[in-house]
């Protein structure tokens, strides 16, 4: 099935360069820069709109989680056809919006870590509903099959579960060694949660919230207490994880959860994106200001391209 938050790629790339307050566009075939937007603040994560014509991008503000400096309060609306900033949505407070996701009804969801909440936003009216979830969420993921939103708490060994229809927290999943980046498989049945204190990714059942399996990031140096991210390919075949301080990434078979590949990266790997051919992926190396293209089956780095400083998130469209 098609996951609205994880659509097949296309001929273009859009990328956030948060340290430069920019969003950049590249040709996916040549990796040549084709456009650039000067953003109103440090822009971190993105999601495509329901009609695929726009991208919603979180304007997080300065600093990092737990050390916010001048936290922002905006979601940027970017038009893909014109490669331009259309407008911004005010989320109602300086909450440092970060992770953004769409549900099947067209609601835009965002984290509000400085309000211990998630935000439900109507993109057409800019109306915002704040839903407290009992902790500071930095990342969210949505299972359309189960009608749930999952939010990871970087400062706790927990992931909150929100019922999308009721718009309230219904459970709290205990996660070993903290919770960092999270992702849901395209079919909606598996939740992947990166650990903070170990080089591991935990696989949970989105229906029962039971821990199914723990995946080690084999080959990584294994530095504790660091940012880690995970994504599942749009076709559901691969799970990718990055380990920020280790400068390392790994690829797993999504069916067997066996590690297929692991490879060293340039400094500070962060967000993944997936190419149109379903055989390659992209990985933003934040501190190096370089994005890698690699083969999913082998982890072999095939190409790379330079970006503005602080590349964090990339989408192929």
Language-model segment annotations:
Residues 1-317:
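Predominantly soluble domains enriched in secretory-pathway, periplasmic, or organellar proteins
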């Amino acid at each position: 099935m098609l996951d609205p938050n994880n659509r097949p790629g296309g001929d273009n790339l859009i990328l956030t360069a948060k340290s430069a307050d920019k969003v950049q566009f590249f040709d996916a075939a040549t990796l040549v820069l084709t456009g650039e937007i000067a953003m109103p603040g440090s822009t971190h994560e993105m999601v495509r709109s329901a009609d695929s014509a726009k991208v919603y991008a979180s304007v997080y503000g300065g600093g990092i989680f737990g050390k916010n400096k001048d936290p922002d309060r905006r979601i940027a609306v970017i038009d893909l056809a014109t490669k331009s900033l259309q407008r911004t949505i005010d989320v109602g407070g300086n909450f440092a919006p970060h992770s953004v996701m769409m549900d099947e009804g067209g609601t835009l969801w965002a984290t509000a870590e400085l309000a211990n909440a998630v935000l439900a936003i109507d993109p057409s009216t800019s109306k915002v509903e704040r839903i407290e979830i009992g902790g500071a969420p930095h990342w969210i993921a949505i299972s359309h099959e189960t009608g749930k939103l999952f939010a990871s708490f970087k400062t706790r060994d927990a992931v909150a579960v929100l019922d999308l229809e009721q718009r309230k927290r219904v459970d709290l999943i205990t996660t070993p060694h903290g919770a960092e980046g999270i992702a849901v498989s395209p079919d909606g049945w598996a939740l992947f949660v990166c650990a903070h204190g170990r080089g591991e990714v935990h696989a949970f059942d989105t229906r029962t919230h039971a821990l199914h399996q723990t995946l080690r990031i084999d080959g990584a140096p294994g530095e504790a207490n660091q940012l880690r991210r995970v994504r599942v390919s749009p076709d559901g075949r691969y799970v990718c994880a990055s380990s920020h301080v280790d400068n390392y990434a790994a690829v797993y078979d999504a069916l067997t959860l066996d590690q297929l590949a692991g490879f060293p990266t340039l400094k500070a790997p962060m967000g993944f994106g997936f190419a149109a051919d379903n055989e390659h992926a992209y990985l933003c190396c934040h501190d190096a200001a370089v994005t890698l293209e690699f083969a999913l089956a082998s982890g072999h780095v095939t190409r790379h391209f330079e970006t503005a400083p602080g590349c964090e998130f990339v989408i192929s469209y």
